[in-house]
Amino acid sequence: MAPTPPATIDDLGLPGALYLGALMESCGRRTRIAPTRRMTLAVMGQLRELGLIDVPWPEPRWEASPEACETPIEGLQWRFAWQAYEPDALAPALRDYLQSVPRDDFAVALRLKIWRELVVAEGERYFEAQLSKHQFDPSWAQDLVFVHRECGLELSAAQWRYCAWAATRQGASIAQQQRLPDPARVREVIFAELRRRVGPVASGQWTNTSFMPFNARPDSALSALFAEHLTTLGELFWALVPSELALLAPARARHVS
């Protein structure tokens, strides 16, 4: 039985509005939905459970569906299923809704949860890029998620980017020393270096461990909506370790400090 969609945008709730907004922004601006493909699939799965979209899963694609859309970067098919709204009018309405979400304890806790998830995902995305740059398997980037779970430490997105860069560079150094390619050993070296870096970076023991992107605007719709509309973080989305204090501080005060 198909789920009954919410009646209005207000009934979506914060995560639902953010996820639907990311899908709409992605298709309107030709950006990826979320930092990683795994997170994108999770977002689309949540939207399907809410009855807002249809997807062909478990089949990869519909053979013939005139109403089907396709995400511009990930190439995932979907169909709009929410009869209460016209798709073209949703993106600005969802941005307005996200900006209006109150800063009560519940909403701040939701923002913090989403920020923490995005920080790790942005680190994983950068890790993928670094691994590909050195001709390693980009799927190794999922090891960052395991390191995060294991260590239980909070880093900023920029600090995760630094750790990913340093670990990949260590792996590249070992690979150059090998007479015969040994990808399994290189992966373990990278994993070990990633684990080794996290503690000193989180404690502030080392300096210059924050890699800010050249373009501070996130290249995924989910992170951009979070940084620019659900919060007032802006470029501090990358620089700050997720915390309630950072979310509650006025933007002007954060920039002054």
Roles of regions detected by a PLM:
Residues 1-257:
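Basic, alpha-helical nucleic-acid-binding regions used in initiation and control of genome expression
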